[in-house]
């Protein structure tokens, strides 16, 4: 944070840099005030360390199983490959191996919900994966595509609410908006990503449900993998810095 003024702002248009400069100054002022009060990283451990959590899809079951350990004090199973693992939209069969594995571990888990998810199937999966209806145990990650959110999400939220199931609702605006550009690259229009996020929040508000998070694929690299955005990246620009080996970030 002390180096915030040196962060790369090349992606920001000139007319918006003033807003970020103001935020930078406020951060620097806050740190200076804390220093003046005698609070610094030398005498406060919280200022020199962070809680860092990892997450990934529990797709390769031989790997996940090899990383699973038993807590000798409780007898519970924990998947040590990540703090939070999720089940993909294509591997969420109620009687499938991925669901069976995830229901047996104590990690918080996620479940991707796409356009083919039926309300009754979702309720069944919730009862399997979170049989004790424990708050914080199960996160439902919607991924419909920008134009399908209002068609599918309300019914799922209504079914969960009717059954009194305790879940966290999250939004994945990436996977439902993947397209193939004319140039052959797999990409995602930023405008579609943003639209799905806005529609997710709108439906959550209408259904009186709490919007609990976003699932976004990002990278610290300077890439040109999604079109649009602040730089208005075109399909022709994708080849400039297309680095991903899988999905566009």
Model-found features: residue ranges?
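Active-site-facing alpha/beta catalytic cores
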Residues: 1-145, 185-188, 195-197, 210-217, ...
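Extended C-terminal subregions enriched in glycine
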Residues: 142-220
């Amino acid at each position: 944070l002390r180096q915030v003024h040196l962060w790369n702002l090349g992606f920001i248009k000139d007319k918006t840099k003033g807003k970020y400069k103001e935020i930078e100054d406020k951060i620097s002022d806050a740190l200076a005030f804390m220093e003046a009060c005698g609070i610094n990283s030398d005498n406060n451990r919280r200022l020199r360390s962070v809680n860092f959590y990892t997450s990934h899809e529990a797709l390769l079951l031989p790997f996940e199983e090899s990383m699973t350990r038993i807590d000798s004090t409780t007898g519970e199973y924990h998947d040590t490959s990540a703090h939070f693992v999720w089940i993909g939209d294509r591997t969420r069969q109620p009687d499938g191996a991925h669901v069976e594995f995830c229901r047996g571990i104590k990690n918080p888990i996620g479940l991707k919900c796409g356009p083919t998810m039926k309300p009754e199937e979702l309720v069944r999966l919730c009862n399997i994966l979170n049989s004790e209806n424990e708050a914080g145990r199960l996160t439902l990650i919607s991924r419909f595509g920008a134009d399908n959110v209002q068609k599918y999400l309300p019914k799922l939220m209504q079914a969960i609410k009717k059954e009194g199931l305790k879940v966290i609702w999250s939004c994945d605006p990436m996977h439902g908006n993947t397209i193939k550009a004319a140039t052959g690259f797999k990409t995602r229009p930023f405008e579609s990503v943003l639209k799905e996020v806005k529609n997710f929040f709108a439906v959550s508000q209408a259904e009186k449900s709490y919007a609990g998070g976003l699932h976004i694929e990002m990278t610290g690299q300077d890439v040109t993998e999604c079109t649009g955005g602040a730089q208005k990246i075109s399909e022709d620009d994708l080849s400039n810095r297309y680095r991903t080996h899988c999905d566009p970030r």
